[in-house]
């Protein structure tokens, strides 16, 4: 249909594998990897950008949860800025090498994994970043992991289009990046079972934290609900006065409700999960 785009990779076996680089120098490696993925996202979005397919992406999560019986359930109300595009799909360590501080990608294509995992054609560029985060969780030493994750995310933002890397696009209340890390963890588990391989413990450890992440998101939404109630009350009070149910003196409640609403909304925003 005239929409095919080919990526050509320099795939020589130079430098060191990503898995080793993430152990030796995780922060510098994550900076280079984030910048590379951001550049790819920019090129991909210039060539292809489709509307948000929230239902398709969430339906796929449900299928994997049902098949894997993970005892987890997570859906995201993706922001309008989350758009489908061309992605790398399977960001595995054997596909990535680090050469003189730069990143070389090789051997990345759909193939068997695309069939087994039933991935949709157009996926958000942030899904590649989620896959990269999974690699950091797998290989990076724990004492440097948080800094490495932050560096990876910030370097991706520095190169990716602003439309898909803005604060709104990364809003943790809507799933942000975390939902794509979750998806990648399910992908890894499904491929391990399909190939009769031993499942990696880091996937189990991360999935065990899902309920904690969701609980924090629920608590934050409680503040949002309270803010909405205050804003609604600030509208209802003047209406009640117009209909004769309240006196003029009681109108002092309006600024009080408005002030409380703004304060609670700020608390809600402040409690948003870190993008990284």
Residue ranges: model-predicted function:
Residues 1-2:
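Short beta-strand micro-motifs within the conserved protein kinase catalytic domain, predominantly
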Residues 6-93, 97-105, 111-127, 131, ...:
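ATP-dependent phospho-/nucleotidyl transfer catalytic cores
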Residues 25, 47-48, 144, 221, ...:
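Short, flexible coil/linker elements and helix-boundary hinge sites characteristic
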Residues 153-166:
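Generic long, charged, amphipathic alpha-helical segments
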Residues 165-168, 173:
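A detector of tandemly repeated sequence units and domain arrays
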Residues 175-179, 224-228, 249-252:
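Alpha-helical transmembrane segments of integral membrane proteins
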Residues 208-234:
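Cytosolic-side membrane-insertion boundary helix
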Residues 229-274:
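Transmembrane alpha-helical hairpins and terminal membrane-anchor modules
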């Amino acid at each position: 249909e005239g929409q095919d785009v080919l990526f050509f990779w320099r795939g020589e076996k130079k430098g060191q594998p990503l898995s080793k680089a993430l152990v030796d120098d995780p922060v510098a490696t994550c900076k280079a990897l984030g910048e590379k993925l951001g550049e790819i996202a920019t090129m991909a979005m210039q060539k292809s950008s489709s509307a948000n397919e929230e239902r398709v992406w969430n339906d796929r999560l449900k299928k994997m949860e049902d098949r894997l019986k993970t005892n987890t359930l997570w859906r995201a109300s993706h922001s309008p800025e989350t758009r489908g595009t061309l992605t790398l799909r399977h960001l595995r360590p054997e596909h990535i090498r680090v050469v003189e501080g730069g990143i070389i990608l090789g051997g990345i294509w759909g193939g068997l994994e695309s069939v087994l995992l039933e991935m949709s054609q157009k996926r958000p560029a942030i899904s590649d970043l989620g896959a990269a985060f999974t690699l950091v969780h797998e290989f990076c030493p724990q004492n440097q992991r948080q800094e490495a994750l932050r560096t990876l995310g910030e370097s991706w933002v520095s190169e990716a289009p602003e439309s898909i890397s803005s604060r709104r696009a990364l809003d943790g209340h809507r799933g942000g990046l975390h939902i794509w890390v979750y998806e990648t963890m399910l992908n890894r588990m499904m491929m391990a079972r399909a190939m009769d391989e031993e499942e990696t413990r880091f996937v189990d450890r991360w999935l065990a934290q899902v309920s904690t992440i969701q609980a924090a998101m629920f608590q934050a939404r409680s503040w949002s609900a309270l803010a909405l109630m205050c804003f609604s009350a600030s509208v209802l009070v003047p209406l009640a006065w117009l209909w004769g149910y309240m006196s003029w003196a009681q109108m002092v409640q309006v600024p009080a409700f408005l002030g409380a609403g703004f304060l609670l909304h700020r608390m809600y925003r402040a409690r948003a999960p870190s993008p990284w």
